[in-house]
Amino acid sequence: MKVTPEKKKGSDTPMMRQYLEVKERYPEYLLLFRVGDFYESFYEDARKVSEALNIVLTRRSNGASADIPMAGFPHHACEGYIARLVKKGFKVTVCDQVEDPSQAKGLVRREITDIVTPGVTYSDEILDDKHNNYLCALCFMKKGRERRAGVAFIDVTTAEFRIADLQPEQVKDMLQSIQPSEILLSSRDKSYSDTVSRILPQEVVVTILDDWMFSEESASQVIERHFKTHSLKGFGIDSAFAARVAAGVVLHYLADTRQNRLQYITRIALVDARDHMTLDLQTKRNLEIISSMQDGSTSGSLLQVIDKTCNPMGARLLRRWLLRPLKRIDAIQARLDAVEVLIEEGAVRKALAEGLGGIHDLERALSRIATFRSMPREVRSLGSSLQKLPAIQALLKDSGSDRLKKLVSGLDLLDEITSIIESAIDPEAGAKLRDGGYIRSGYNAELDLLRSVSSNAKSGLMEIQQAERRKTAISTLKIQYNRVFGYYIEVSKANSDKVPDYYEKKQTLVNAERYTIAELKEYEVKILNADEKSQMLEQELFRDLCVRITACSKEIQQNAEIVAELDCLHSYACCSEAYGYVKPEVKEHGNLSIKNGRHPVLERILHVDEPYVPNDCFFDKKQRMLMVTGPNMAGKSSYLRQNGLIVLLAQVGCFVPADAAEIGLVDRIFTRVGASDNLTSGESTFLVEMNEAANILNNATGKSLILLDEIGRGTSTYDGMSIAWAMSEYIQSVVGARTLFATHYHELAELEERFDSISNYNATVVETADKVVFLRKIVRGASDNSYGIEVARMAGMPSEVIQRAKEILSGMEKRDIMISFGKECAGTIEPQSRQIYLFEEEERKLKNAIEALNINTMTPLDALLELKKLQDLAGGDG
């Protein structure tokens, strides 16, 4: 903002001084200032708002000072406009009028009523039902020689609050996993914002905070105060010093943004990396777990195929499950057994789906109720959702799955609060508090009495109307109401001469006159007093109900977690049965056996007349790397991805697309697939490729699964082949991970002769007289042809280009390459006209030297000397 409040105070209007005082407290926020029926922004904020919302930038008079820029929008549309600003990365402060302007003595009193940032919002206009919205804090600390990174992330709409204590180099993977909307950094670490901008979407906001907020003492005090405890040992986070500081920063920031009703955030949990697999950005992207590489949407992703959830809580948890596969066999097996039971018991599964579908978003409803942002209809929905729990509990309490039984036994049916909501909120309640009438009759005696007074008084109005019609002989006389004039008698202009003297005129219209009388005034006072008191009492009762619901936060959140997990297991069962998946066996060993595996996404999008071709995959102690060669478009990349996805599905506890599968537990899945430039970071295709390859070699273990596709494609042939060869040797000799390596370097097939652990496989083709058919079947043995020309033909290359490519390929294979040149070539292809030989420079020199020899005039000694020269030339000495 290009204005200094201190310097302007004398000449600004009182309202602008009020504005500037508020703006001074929130300089980094867009300030929306309520003026009448509009929210206005001024100065530099106005320019930003005008540009972001594409609304008119105008000017406002400012007393003796110069006119100032102004942009605004109607107050009733504020939620949509604020959502647009926040989605564009702005942080917004809302300053409202907190008294009736007509009752104000002088300047209307205004206060900050809301602060909205990308990471702190409850608005449905901003949030996605199926996505978490995380606020995240990062803290980098050093104790002695140990350097640690703390990550804390919270979704204020669901009360999920977690921390992770990491090595600094692990932070990027964590951020890419949680995908926060806003990140809090210390001023000391603000340079890390450059890293954030490289690894996260552009709209993620980085907020820099004062360094003192990142002290251990400050953080501990904030956490202990929030959770009302004197020690953090009971939370299991006492030793995670950097993560604990990050958690304190999150809570401090929420307080700074006026989030002062956070009683519903009742838990904080430590993320244990030993329990879950870490998926880096490349793996998530290359396997298309959550989104498609084509357009970034869920269409074409694993999530789209697997997601059969019935409510938003389950949908959000399913995303988290897919991004955090399990590494504990007992947890995996518990999910698999539950899915098996739900598949076998179709009637139970159907009834469960009906129950889950009737449950609304308990987590987000609770957060809005606890912060007094909720409306009566949402409270009613929460109550009706709780009413579904007994049926779900009864349905699964005798289940054949221990996990399902344990889950439903943990449900708290909350009979008392459910009954209170049922008796308090009218089923026909309006969407807004101002609509009134949402508290049921019989819930509160005082409210019933006030409503009776109002109702009886309104009946009295009808009696007055009938009496006045008789007295005046005006049959069209009506008693009506509006907010400006209150109750009045309306008489048409044609009948105005019949109006008696005791009528007091209130308003003149084009076609009518409006009056009042003493009796009407008395009733008006009774009605308005009763209505006003009734409305105030309703709001008070509703607020008290919200407080009572908030007191049950722990129980409601526990129910929400259970419902979400049941929903995910139900989703697994639905897709597993529908798609013919099988229950995998997950073991502690390092083997892997998949019989007739299928790609879970590709098989769903292929045409009916083009069935997906299944393939086997096998690893044991002896066979650790499958070197897959074969033509382009023959299915090598799909084969790699399908096996990665099958392993991932098994370890998230879902059945898998195969005839049978035994999965040796995998600690991480690494992928290096395709080529992509990171030009915004100044990184070429090859550098990106090498960075990703280095990450794999440095972090993979003997329990990992590595998927490599076309390593070395971003550089020269010999460089690329050398790197691919060396990587293969290193993985087998040092790392020992199960590896699928798809390559167009057919020379790598020779590695099978050097390593017992490497086996050659190829994607089969059938050659006919005029074309090649890709069978997409992976079989034992190496391939010696990539059939690139056939792929070019399928892509629609002109037939002349295809024919010429075949001739050039034939020549190259014979080391006798001939390319036509000259003006005669324009528009025509003449394979045998005017030829030149293309040799490497050394070969050209050798050829010229041989052609220059005149063997008819040489003596035997001359011939030997010339032969020696040719040897030197061939050896590079010439």
Swiss-Prot record:
Domain of life, per UniProt, equals Bacteria
- A single BP term in Gene Ontology: mismatch repair
Listed Gene3D superfamilies: 1.10.1420.10, DNA repair protein MutS, domain I, MutS, connector domain, P-loop containing nucleotide triphosphate hydrolases
Q: Name one Pfam family in it.
A: MutS_III
Q: Which SMART domains match?
A: MUTSac (SM00534), MUTSd (SM00533)
Q: Name one GO molecular function term.
A: ATP binding
The record, for SUPFAM superfamilies, names: DNA repair protein MutS, domain I, DNA repair protein MutS, domain II, DNA repair protein MutS, domain III, P-loop containing nucleoside triphosphate hydrolases
Q: Which GO terms describe its cellular component?
A: cytosol
Keywords, A to Z?
A: ATP-binding, DNA damage, DNA repair, DNA-binding, Nucleotide-binding
The keyword DNA repair is annotated on this UniProt entry: yes
The protein's job, in short, is: This protein is involved in the repair of mismatches in DNA. It is possible that it carries out the mismatch recognition step. This protein has a weak ATPase activity.
| Family as reported in the entry's similarity comment | Belongs to the DNA mismatch repair MutS family.
Kindly provide the name given to this protein in its UniProt entry. DNA mismatch repair protein MutS
Q: Which organism is it from?
A: Chlorobium phaeobacteroides (strain BS1)
